[in-house]
């Protein structure tokens, strides 16, 4: 590609269901290629299927791209020189193109029913499931008029060329479909509504798309699109044929293609768990591409600087949740403390989690958990002890730590902490170590395990002394007293 070439790529989902990680991976590769080349990223909505499309799904697509920071240069909400960018608003354009294809002899009206096509195959000794047999190509005007008189409504089909259809795929290399392997295909329904095989290439042509980066599941449709491009060029709708790159499939468990039924395919489930955009985008980038053999962790800016579609692997990529989680944890650690606190606060607010801390205290709480979590949702499990309404004693932790031997430990801890004047981490640490390590001569685990469980409800928590400072004097003492009472009750004879 020369520097004078202007790259124009597009992301053109249908607004059905919730955004799928494979779909977003395709968007990411298109976006990164546009940004790498200084080109244009076009966002287009393919919403011509009124039975399946929904406004909620359309809004979810906008939400997904905005959350991930993949801004578009042309498309819904912002417009552009080749709008409108929703296919449902472009029907007059498709009608005009169909009329021009018919007038030029590039397409024709086909009246055959599926039953008639199957019967002709059987009569000729062919497989009845071969598909359309090009029977209507050369109907006379009288025959067409007779079919119309019967009330038949034709579909419009493209007249496929009797030549091999070859392209050099930017991911898979030279690919050829031999002449005759693809029958004349429908551009419209019988009611005249345009179909995907027409509208997708027409929009690409009119929007001057130069590179089509899409999933490999669409590879079989490429010869039809090449043939249609040839016709569109001849009637003056298209200037040229774009370059194609078919991206590898994303597999799920058992090496089966990741489907919408697989939980990990739902982009918003990852967001709800607490993935941050940097972590998820880093992982999605690795589904078919790598920045270097020994370099899995990178920023979006680093990806943009390095991304070339020619480097995309053709082999299927497997979605590995553990690997995705690990990368997200690394990106959480890379955030500066103030930014992490901001994001964690926003996540807690969205999910209704309350800590009762002021901004400075919350920033400190966030600092304590930043290196201890994989997703933002993990932080609530570590910090929910700060909310009295959410505080509970974990049964396993209590059974292990709040036993008979915990009674004197918690008693000594209470006595020591009641004498602390300045309720801060250093004073709390000094008091507890003096009472439990120095005077009772306990090992740290035996000394602090019961205190941790009594105060936070769990054996797993942020650092103990800092946690007690955040909890405050009164609540800390009340929790330790309740923990001592629990231990005493557990030790008392039953019956």
Swiss-Prot record:
Instruction: Report the CDD domains cross-referenced here.
Output: GluRS_core (cd00808)
Residues annotated for ATP binding in this entry: 260
Report if keyword Aminoacyl-tRNA synthetase is assigned.
yes
Give the location of motif 'HIGH' region in residue numbers: 13-23
Q: What is its main location?
A: cytoplasm
Enzyme class comes to ligase
User: Can you say what this protein is called?
Assistant: Glutamate--tRNA ligase
Catalyses which reaction(s): tRNA(Glu) + L-glutamate + ATP = L-glutamyl-tRNA(Glu) + AMP + diphosphate
| Molecular-function annotations in GO | ATP binding; glutamate-tRNA ligase activity; tRNA binding; zinc ion binding
- Tell me the disulfide pairings in this chain: none
The protein's gene is named gltX
Q: Which UniProt keywords apply?
A: Aminoacyl-tRNA synthetase, ATP-binding, Cytoplasm, Ligase, Nucleotide-binding, Protein biosynthesis
Q: Might you report a single GO cellular component term?
A: cytosol
